Regions:
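Early extracytoplasmic/lumenal segment of secretory-pathway proteins
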Residues: 1-52
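Extracytoplasmic
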Residues: 9, 34, 41-43, 90-92, ...
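Structural recognition of the beta-strand scaffold that forms the well-ordered cores
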Residues: 14-17, 37-40, 96, 103-105, ...
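Short helices/loops that flank or line small-molecule/ion binding pockets
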Residues: 24-35, 51-52, 121, 177-180, ...
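Hinge/lid segment of periplasmic solute-binding proteins
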Residues: 44-99, 113-117
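Hydrophobic/proline-rich hinge and linker segments of small-molecule sensing/allosteric domains
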Residues: 101-113
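Flexible hinge/capping segments at coil-to-helix
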Residues: 112-126
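Ligand-binding pocket segment of bilobal, Venus flytrap-like solute-binding proteins
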Residues: 130-133, 140, 144, 150-204
Length: 204
């Protein structure tokens, strides 16, 4: 608030809202229940919002930062622009907040480093009832298809990006198969309570 006042001379009151999953936020906006100045969704939601004309162009003054322009901008802009729609570049509407944050958090007291190097550990019955998954269908789908295509990924015959954007009936059936096999191992689908479960050794 103080920074905004310093930059613009205007007083504002910040209202900060969080949502368990992207889709709840998107539904509120689509139904006209909420308007936001800034939202922080995952990339697939940015793509949906752009398709539905739910975004406004952003002020790009920040882009005059030499460090951003020389080190970060070229790669990030390329990735964001993959979400572009006809006549609309996504980088006019979005900037990157985090990148490549999906991974495995584990307790070394129960799970060796060598085991956690592969998504295979999630399907290991040894850890049944001690695994939490993010309550995100995108993350769950990605985990399943990456695991299912581990051999092809290693051989370089397919990329993660191609797998994540393949929603063909065959891809969906394969993801369903592996997620059903994973289900008995899952203790819960979490948005934020996972950290507490980890600290109490209720999840590994």
């Amino acid at each position: 608030q103080a920074y905004y006042k310093e930059q613009t001379g205007e007083n504002i009151r910040i209202v900060y809202q969080t949502f368990d999953i992207n889709e709840i936020m998107l539904t509120k906006i689509e139904k006209g229940h909420e308007d936001f100045d800034v939202v922080c969704p995952s990339e697939y939601i940015i793509e949906r919002m752009l398709k539905k004309h739910l975004l406004l162009p952003i002020d790009t003054n920040f882009a005059h930062s030499p460090n951003y322009m020389n080190n970060v901008a070229p790669f990030i802009r390329k990735q964001i622009n993959k979400l572009s729609q006809p006549g609309e570049k996504a980088s006019r509407y979005a900037v990157c907040y985090m990148w490549g944050t999906a991974g495995i958090l584990y307790n070394r007291a129960y799970v060796p480093d060598s085991v956690a190097l592969s998504w295979d550990c999630l399907w290991n019955k040894k850890y049944a009832g001690k695994i939490l998954m993010k309550d995100s269908y995108r993350d769950a789908y990605g985990t399943a298809v990456i695991y299912a295509h581990a051999k092809e990924l290693k051989e370089g015959t397919v990329t993660v990006e191609e797998l994540m954007n393949d929603y063909s009936p065959r891809a969906m059936e394969l993801a369903e198969k592996y997620l059903k096999a994973l289900k008995p191992n899952i203790a819960g689908w979490e948005a934020d309570f996972g950290k507490e479960m980890m600290t109490k050794n209720k999840a590994w």
